[in-house]
């Protein structure tokens, strides 16, 4: 947009559409587009002492580039309250309103939580993660019956694909899967 205002929204949109899991962890100050990035991450972890805010309206501008993402993540009521008040809040409140999934009490705990989460993510099949993200992002945007039909088709394709075969074989053999084209 004019003056480069679309750059933050473009980056946030890319994060939403990424075919891999987007994990965000923060412990310091996060404001404006940073809150938008936090809102679109698939997994969101924070320190309790983190300071988050939406200062845009206090600066005379709307949080235009991140507003749709905040509404989708937090719901209209909560997103509107934060935006029209220039809301400032900590990591505990971020969890309470649904912006973050878990809170860590210090930097070491956040690093440990991130490491555990990344290990969990890396155990999952990359292709299955990509399809899952697409299905979940389509939820609410596509008619329910069409979404279910698409989900059934995606499942059938995945089950017959290399990842589906390896995943089920590993399960039956009681071992960790060795994902084609990736490292577990």
PLM feature segments, named:
Residues 86-92, 108-112, 116-184:
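C-terminal alpha-helix plus adjacent terminal tail
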